[in-house]
């Protein structure tokens, strides 16, 4: 009587190391995982008592089996940067747009949106692209001006994230965990990771997931590589590569519409 029980059903699969999720910091009775390797990592390193961590699948995965893909739609979803979006007293304040425009983040993504080669690929293969940055970066949305009229800048107030993930045929992201949802649906993608070293030092540290070894698509560090990989994917009608499909299937051995049911039953048993 009077005791509280904490159960965690997260919004995404963890792939980096996140110390605030350690048992000593959460005291959670049930930590629900969405993937086998994630489960093994948290079980073995986060300090939870036996059977407190379970691989049940995230409840929202139940909604990722019934979808209709727009075959020519590419979704671009960059993640956020803590040192830009949530400045501390020790870091730069980027409320000034001119300061934001000096960041590598802005310059890289703006160059991406204004790439002549990407514009040509979209036109050549009759593709549409939706650029939807992380919610924390949306305050800078008006600063992005794509060269192609085939690229839509998406305001979070007008688009449903899960809807975009379900209907899009191909994903481009950097480090956003939404790639896990895309991979769960067995879809193709590529990563544009131009600032990985700074990201690891200033935001999330390396976890169990190594993008070049475990990722669900090619890892690009330069815009030229993105241009080449996107043209290659478009020429292949945005079909998934056999190797990346195999990785996706192996990463999510639980692949059904019983995620909510498993979570419900696990909670009842506590």
State the predicted function of each range.
Residues 135-180:
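Donor nucleotide-activated moiety binding/catalytic core segment of transferases
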